Amino acid sequence: MARVKRGVTAHAKHKKVYKAAKGFRGRRKNTIRAAKAAVDKAGQYAFRDRKRKKRTFRALWIQRINAAVRPLGMTYSVFINGLAKSGVIVDRKVLSDLAIHEPVAFQAIAEKAKAALAA
């Protein structure tokens, strides 16, 4: 069997790593060892932050809802409790969007929640 030299394979592998490391600073973009480590770490950060993004957005929606219901005389937790009691099933993303873009509709929902708490 003929001897196989690994030049072509190694070059292709390195090229793949360098492509993934494009835009990195310093040695991280042009030294294979540093580039490989940087690309691995970038993948870890990407995986972690895809999970974290969901938490971050939920927190943002909650802050927006809280800011919108305070002038109406409620806190966020009281408002959510009122929604649950009134049977309104609207998620936080939609509530946040309504609070920003459709304040009249949001106010109507808030009044319904307030009425459910009073009853």
From Swiss-Prot:
The gene is rplT. GO terms for biological process: ribosomal large subunit assembly; translation. GO terms for molecular function: rRNA binding; structural constituent of ribosome. Belongs to the bacterial ribosomal protein bL20 family. Transmembrane segments: none annotated. Keywords: Ribonucleoprotein, Ribosomal protein, RNA-binding, rRNA-binding. Pfam families: Ribosomal_L20 (PF00453). PANTHER family: 39S RIBOSOMAL PROTEIN L20. SUPFAM superfamilies: Ribosomal protein L20. One of its GO terms (cellular component) is ribonucleoprotein complex. It comes from Rhodopseudomonas palustris (strain BisA53). This is Large ribosomal subunit protein bL20. Binds directly to 23S ribosomal RNA and is necessary for the in vitro assembly process of the 50S ribosomal subunit. It is not involved in the protein synthesizing functions of that subunit. The keyword NAD does not apply.
